[in-house]
Amino acid sequence: MNRNFCASVFIINPETKKILLVKHKKMNKWVQPGGHIENNETPEEAALREVYEETGLKVSLIGERFPREDDFIKPLGIQRNANKMGDLHIDIIYYGVPVNNIEPHALEDENTDVKWFSREELDKIDVFPDIKITMDYILKEYYGG
């Protein structure tokens, strides 16, 4: 079994409370932007790079930073997922907000589309259940509802 360390970002627009998802070509599902952490790359760097590569957006990661200035932002969570071949993906998940006002667009071959969704719209599209659970958590913790 291979272990792949990944980083991803749940991006919420603070004004509209919508989440940005990418349509993953292989899975044919809407997922948060993210991907494998490269050698000599921190999880934060990988998360920011993957978001930019997949959507063209620059984001700011939100979360507690431990006391020392060069410590990392505490991730929203860490998730284990096994794929059909039995490989394990360990995903370090962050919460982020956009810092530029460009319209996101699919930039990588892995994704076919990029779109903002309201929480209600998530019930009408093909997403993994944890996407809804995580969005509900972010809306409650950061936006009071």
Provide a role label for each language-model segment.
Residues 1-19, 92-95:
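Conserved N-terminal beta-strand and adjoining loop/helix that marks the start
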Residues 3-5, 30, 87-88, 115:
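Residues that recognize and position ribonucleotide moieties
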Residues 21-23:
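Short, acidic/hydrophobic/Gly-rich beta-strand patch recurrent on exposed beta strands
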Residues 27-29, 122:
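A short, flexible beta-alpha/helix-coil linker loop
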Residues 31-35:
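A short gly/proline-enriched turn/hairpin at secondary-structure junctions
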Residues 37-130:
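Unchanged
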Residues 123-145:
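Charged phosphate-binding loop/patch that engages nucleotide di/tri-phosphates or the phosphate backbone
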